[in-house]
Amino acid sequence: KKVNIQAVKKPDTAVQMYKDGQLDTANISSTEAIYKANKNSKDVVDSPEATTAYLNYNESGSVKALTNTKIRQALNLATDRGGIVKAAIDTGSKAASALVPTGLETLEDGTDLSEYVSQDYTYDAKQAAKLFKEGLAELGEKSITLTITADSDTPVAKASVDYIKQTWEDVLPGLKVEEKFVTFKQRLQDSKTQNFDVVLSLWGGDYPEGSTFYGLFTSDSAYNYGKFSDATYDAAYQKALTTDALDPAAAADDYKAAEKALYDNAHYNPLYFRSTKALQNSSIKGLVRNSTGLQVDFTYAYKDK
């Protein structure tokens, strides 16, 4: 048997090729318009992803305002995640309540790890404004300007940042938000060198276990772009890898403690769990879509004639 894979740059072109019978599957979650136009098709299938979108805050010291915990907490509280998903990225994604996404790992009692470790990441404009005012006073400032960096080649990134800018500025008097869009490659480079204030990042799990996400933010991790160091977080993560490595339930408790440390100190800002849907020819059988690792497995796939 033979699998023909075509690289189609434009998502709308791929969808049209699918409808014309030139392709057997096509992603419909690339843009809101494509998703809305096709989400009710009988050919829609889930294409699971263990991917979380989140904001990194530069805590290295080069951005004075973001070294203040209350400022970061205020930004988190001023983030309307449900609003972002609905208004900016209506492509099947869901508001995030943790670093680890739904569908990555299921515990022995059937609980999703993401639900088990989730924290109270809620939108609270009043509390956000209060903490922001207190943070400004601690900094000796009356106003601050923060720049959000994101990918220029992703429509969803532009829509998300626009929405965040609007809500942050509406909720937090004294805050001005600027936007900076760069290529994916440049965004990664800027992240690695702390050439950012706030940066929109995405991470997809490599394997179905919590450490594929919680390894990101240890003090010595190359992916800890914000350069924060949290002893409680580090200890919880190390316990999951060592003492509790053979006890999934205990490791889940460790990951929950790690998530709480992130939440309490607002070291990052979870936005949404990315979900992808696709159109797939109903005659295609045995095609396996995984959330981690080999995302599309053709091993047992065949076309029913």
How does the language model describe each region?
Residues 2, 51-98, 144-155, 245-264:
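Alpha-helical secondary-structure segments
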Residues 4-63, 86-87:
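Extracellular/periplasmic solute-recognition and catalytic clefts
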Residues 12-23, 36-40, 69-70, 162-170, ...:
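Short helices/loops that flank or line small-molecule/ion binding pockets
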Residues 85, 174-187, 214-281, 305:
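Extracytoplasmic/peripheral linker and loop segments enriched in polar/acidic and small residues
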Residues 95-134, 155-157, 246:
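Structural transition elements
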Residues 133-205, 276:
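Ligand/substrate-recognition segments at binding pockets and active sites
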